[in-house]
UniProtKB/Swiss-Prot annotation:
Belongs to the RecR family. The keyword Lipid metabolism does not apply. Residues 80-177 form the Toprim domain. It comes from Brachyspira hyodysenteriae (strain ATCC 49526 / WA1). InterPro entries: DNA_Rcmb_RecR (IPR000093), Rcmb_RecR (IPR023627), Rcmb_RecR_Znf (IPR015967), TOPRIM_dom (IPR006171), TOPRIM_RecR (IPR034137). Gene3D superfamilies: 3.40.1360.10, RecR Domain 1. The gene is recR. This is Recombination protein RecR. Keywords: DNA damage, DNA recombination, DNA repair, Metal-binding, Zinc, Zinc-finger. One of its GO terms (molecular function) is DNA binding. GO terms for biological process: DNA recombination; DNA repair. May play a role in DNA repair. It seems to be involved in an RecBC-independent recombinational process of DNA repair. It may act with RecF and RecO.
Length: 201
């Protein structure tokens, strides 16, 4: 068997990416081999500077070029409304609907005992501090439909109430298929879910 060490190593690294199997990783590795040196250098430079150039917004924890992201620094956004999402791709999906003009808070995960993700592993403490230090009128929870999402939403609701938050706490409706998630939902369905959001009791 003709094993090429460098190619095998590259294939192994690529196959660690989500959704990439060994065969696809091999095809991508061969594609990169066929690329010219200029492209490979540019590709390498971007990868090596990824953590240096991309930051977490100090307010909402979105990915950003700067310490404060474009949304949080935009005076035209409704800063009295916070949409809580699990991840950056979920935030992008909601932005794409053009039906929400508030700001965001990215948790970085959902409570999941089976996966070993507890309350302290996601940014609930930071959310409460943010709400307590600002004049917030509405918290909109926008999670995909799952048991972990329900658990996390319920905990956030209880914690906000325990901290005397008197504004609205809403949650998007499930126009989204249970087999889907926010990141992959079509914009029309997601927009309707936002417009039809309901108050949590």
């Amino acid at each position: 068997m003709n094993n090429i060490q460098s190619l095998d190593k590259l294939t192994q690294i690529i196959s660690r990416l989500p959704g990439i199997g060994t065969r696809t990783a091999m095809r991508l590795a061969l594609y990169l081999f066929d690329c010219d040196d200029e492209y490979l250098k540019e590709f390498s430079d971007v990868l090596s500077s990824l953590h240096e150039n991309i930051k977490l917004c100090q307010v909402c924890y979105s990915l950003s070029d700067n310490d404060i992201c474009d949304i949080c620094s935009n005076d035209k956004r409704e800063h009295n409304k916070i949409c809580i999402v699990e991840s950056y791709p979920d935030m992008l999906a909601i932005e794409k609907t053009e039906e929400y003009n508030g700001v965001y808070h990215i948790l970085g995960g959902l409570i999941s005992p089976l996966k070993g993700i507890g309350i302290s592993d996601i940014r609930i403490k930071e959310l409460i501090e943010r709400v307590n230090n600002n004049s917030i009128e509405e918290i909109m929870i926008a999670f995909s439909a799952s048991l972990e999402a329900d658990t996390t939403a319920s905990y956030i609701y209880k914690t906000l109430k325990d901290n005397n938050f008197n504004g609205r706490i809403t949650r998007i409706t499930y126009g989204i298929s249970l087999a889907s998630d926010i990141e992959n939902a079509d914009s029309r369905s997601l927009a309707r879910s936002i417009l039809d959001r309901v108050d949590m009791n």
